[in-house]
Amino acid sequence: MAVNANQGKVAIVTGGGSGIGKAAALALLGDGWSVALAGRRAEALEQVANSPDAKGRALAVATDVTDPASVKALFEMTVKTWGRVDLLFNNAGMGLGGAALEDITVDDWKRVVDTNLNGMFYCIQQAFRVMKSQQPMGGRIINNGSISAHAPRPGSIAYTATKHAVTGLTKTAALDGRKYDIAVGQIDIGNAVTELAARMVKGVPQANGEIRTEPLMDVDIVGRSVLYMASLPLDANVLFHTVMATKMPFVGRG
């Protein structure tokens, strides 16, 4: 019988109560990982933690990624429970739902930046601190970018700006992590079926001004993609991985 190399490995998944985070967490749990589920909605996290695949290997940790102290507590709780962190799926994010550029308030702009950029940095920083200090040293970080890390949608300036910034975080953290055996990569996802993408079925603005529905893909495909990236040995890394609905507007939005 083959030995599962991932059995007993430890992951943190932010935004783990729904959508992409939930799909990734369930894929990891199904493969034998222990998973700390982080997010703001404790009830949603508990539902995932109590799923059949969890088998006592899931921990729900209410977390606000925009608060450095809350992120620090998440990592401390994970290490206290399982002794280490092998994977961070840095997934928590938000958008403004197609708000016109001139109507975005300063508070809304700051909220998106605080979640999608600052929160992601706080998680990367804590992961580095833990992964550098543990034995064996090292681990993997997978940042959730987006097709919007390549090309924008109309009315998405805050979301797109932060997702472009995530690419900068990924490239720099990948470089800085080399000497500590910390592999850093990014998954850029297009049109997975989630609450965030639900408006696609009603039609969304296109670059030419039209309103069109767009094809979607099963979010479980994203979960399996994250699991594949997470399962590589630390001497190999998927730096950038794009997974998208085949017939959606491509990364150039054409």
Language-model-detected regions and their locations in the chain:
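Conserved glycine-rich cofactor-binding loop
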Residues: 17-19
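Active-site helix of classical SDR
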Residues: 124, 162
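The beta1-alpha1 cofactor-binding region of Rossmann-like NAD(H)/NADP(H)-dependent oxidoreductases
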Residues: 62-74, 106
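Conserved glycine-rich Rossmann-like NAD(P)H-binding loop of the short-chain dehydrogenase/reductase
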Residues: 31-47
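Substrate-binding pocket helix/loop in short-chain dehydrogenase/reductase
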Residues: 99-101, 108-110
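C-terminal helical subdomain
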Residues: 186-187, 205-252
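Residue(s) in the substrate-gating loop at a strand-loop-helix junction
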Residues: 146
